[in-house]
A protein has these predicted regions:
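Short, solvent-exposed beta-strand edge segments and adjacent coil->beta transition regions
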Residues: 39, 103-107, 135-139
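Short alpha-helical functional segments enriched in proximate histidine and acidic residues
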Residues: 61, 84, 162
Length: 167
């Protein structure tokens, strides 16, 4: 991503490469850099082939599964996660992510009453991958490509166990 206020400023220091050179003069080898304007002027060179092989494999997975299928599963997984969290009661957990699936992705941000980063650390120790945001938000994102409904269930069970053991 290159912000538009920087995209056309050719005086800014940057890494430059083959792909940021003007296509019309690129092969003339004049010894001077003829930078493209806009975000294209920030491109580097060809990516390493081994890195691209891994990216190709991951893109193949997305194509095999299908984006529409991922979206459907994502909505169901996140809806299930939301349902399970609401069973804990809003006096314990507040979901601050919009409830409308059209206004969110797979991530739910939650606030847990009287919790701090210790709760996040305990979830991490229990094998849950989540994200902590000050002052009191834990973000969890059941990802449809590799998370299951059982994963979501186990996450909430671990959360309940940690909350029950907390003073």
């Amino acid at each position: 991503f290159v912000h538009e206020r920087h995209a056309h400023n050719k005086d800014l220091n940057r890494f430059t490469g083959w792909w940021s050179h003007n296509k019309k003069t690129r092969f003339k080898m004049r010894g001077e850099f003829d930078q493209l304007s806009g975000a294209e002027g920030w491109q580097l060179s060809n990516p390493p082939i081994l890195s691209m092989a891994a990216i190709k494999a991951s893109l193949d997975m997305f194509q095999d599964v299908g984006i529409e299928n991922l979206i459907k599963k994502s909505r169901k997984l996140t809806g299930y996660f939301e349902f399970l969290l609401k069973q804990l009661g809003e006096d314990t957990i507040k979901i601050i992510t919009p409830s409308n699936p059209d206004e969110r992705g797979c991530q739910l941000s939650i606030q847990v009453k009287n919790a701090n980063k210790t709760l996040h650390d305990k979830l991490t120790a229990a094998g849950v991958i989540s994200d902590w945001r000050e002052p009191d938000v834990i973000r969890c994102a059941p990802t449809p490509l590799y998370n299951s409904f059982e994963d979501v269930y186990r996450l909430v069970e671990k959360l309940k166990k940690i909350l029950k053991a907390s003073p």
